[in-house]
Amino acid sequence: MKVTPGFKASDLPLARTLTLGGMKVHALEAGIQWLDGGAMFGVVPRPLWEKKIPPDSRHRIPLALRCLLVEAPNALVLVDTGIGNKESEKFKDIYGVDNAGDPTRLEEAIRSLGFHTGDVDLVVSTHLHFDHAGGNLVLREDGTLAPSFPRARFVVQKGELGFAGSPNERVRASYMAKNYAPLVEADLVDVVEGPTELVEGVRLLPTPGHTPFHQSVILESQGEKAIFLADLCPTSAHLPL
């Protein structure tokens, strides 16, 4: 799909399905955000990256808020939750957030597959930046926060949770306590440390870089294997560059 400066979330399908051995894996498109292209590509010269992803008038490029829904043999596992519905209109303008309102686009994607938020058993955060963990909690009409997935346990690396609570100045704006602290207080978080076999067919592997305790998700079924890299590789354009 060609990415243009006018690219919208509605240009993406709600969900795409891959069969991995005997397991179904669904890529959920929870929306898009627009971030500074130079910041995303770092030392790569602009003349190179803008050929891959043209920026808008504010020098931003669109990034998919992509989550993963895994039909593991013994659990329904959601990996990352996008931005959610808690942010202000000012925030949405700054970051170019396009993820629908109520229900969020993530919830629509889950419903499109015949599931509901209450069917999710485990929610894995690859890391706790707002664009990956913002949908962990939902803002209700009365102004209170509630878990977006009422039956789920939330899984995060111990180091990531600690770092989120005391980040350095460079990344402070990316971490928001409202996206995870209420879950910790409600004892809904399962902290893991290092490589972890989550459930049959789903393993967690620390892949530090984007954050010190970022983790990727390895899926295996009937001899086939896939890995969800999350922000270890922000876009496909990063690979040839």
Positions of predicted regions on the chain:
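Metallo-beta-lactamase
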Residues: 1-115, 119-131, 141, 223-230, ...
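Active-site metal-binding loops of divalent metal-dependent hydrolases
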Residues: 30-31, 81-84, 128, 159-160, ...
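Short acidic/glycine-rich loop or secondary-structure boundary segments that cap or lie
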Residues: 36, 163-166, 198-201, 212-215, ...
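Metal-dependent phosphodiesterase/nuclease catalytic metal-binding core
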Residues: 69, 203-205, 215-240
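Short acidic, glycine/proline-rich loop/turn micro-motifs
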Residues: 88-93, 167, 239-241
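A short, conserved alpha-helix within the catalytic core of class I
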Residues: 135-141
